Amino acid sequence: MSSSAHDHPELGPPQLIEVADRVFGYIQPDGTWYINNTGFIVGDRSVISIDACSTERRTRAYLDRIASVTPAPVTTLVNTHHHGDHTYGNCVFGDITIIGQERCRAEIIATGLLGNTGIWEPVDWGELTLAPPTVTFTDRLRLWSGDLPVDLRYVGQPAHTSNDTLVWLPEQQVLFCGDLLFNGGTPFLLMGSVTGAIEVLTTVVAPIPAAAIVSGHGAVCGPDLIGTVVGYLRFVLEIARRGLAAGVPPLDAARDTELGEYAGWLDSERIVGNLHRAYCDLEPSRGKPDLFAALSDMVAYNGGRPLSCRA
């Protein structure tokens, strides 16, 4: 196995940023498919990690960086949601307490490990086994890192997924928000809700007095990113309304759309999956979107090529 964090040196090494005293963000470039951010909180005798990485190799590199900061063991792992880029590496942590919202555990078990499906470029996942949360909560849970409170909060409704959890450090004013925010990348709502994400960001996330936000992908940011992401989601809803009125499917609506200010965001093909979800949000009688059909449409939008994945 390569000792590097990844097999794509052009991406550059992950950045370790101390966003507050004893609180670190681990930022993996370039934040595209399956290249996520994690973070950790250093206590006197133990460490709390927020999320794992997508591959064995990346997760081991992350654990090495934690060990470079403190000899204290990682005893607790919090999953912000069930997606594999944040949870596949759970098993690499060994026998520790894994915490997630109750639907996070259920979705991890139901979804399993992805493998190489042809939707994305092939990935060397490493030796992985499914490791869902061993402790679950419904709405809120408070952890302690020494004398530092760490508050877990389910956002209350589907947004990025059905089980998004905020990790808020009130004394440090640091928020880990998982994939509710992407910084420089296109948000992805196929397994959540576009309308729900707008409501969560505006009524749950925005009121939190965060001085620093570690998003699920991209650079550490401030609260200004919330409005930027909400603007994109409202743009998606407007395209969906037009598509439904014209009777065109999501792929055609996406192909007819000029992305404008969002064209430079990474993974722009997500507009297709987002429209599949937005159609269902606006017309609930459609039920849930067909995930494989939506992902296949994203490949079609990408010129028939598998989606770029350099995890």
Regions found by a protein language model. Give the residues of each.
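Divalent metal-coordination and catalytic microenvironments
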Residues: 22, 41, 51, 66, ...
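Short acidic-hydrophobic surface loop/beta-edge motif
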Residues: 17-19, 41, 140-145, 215
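N-terminal amphipathic/basic leader segments beginning at the initiator methionine
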Residues: 2-23, 149
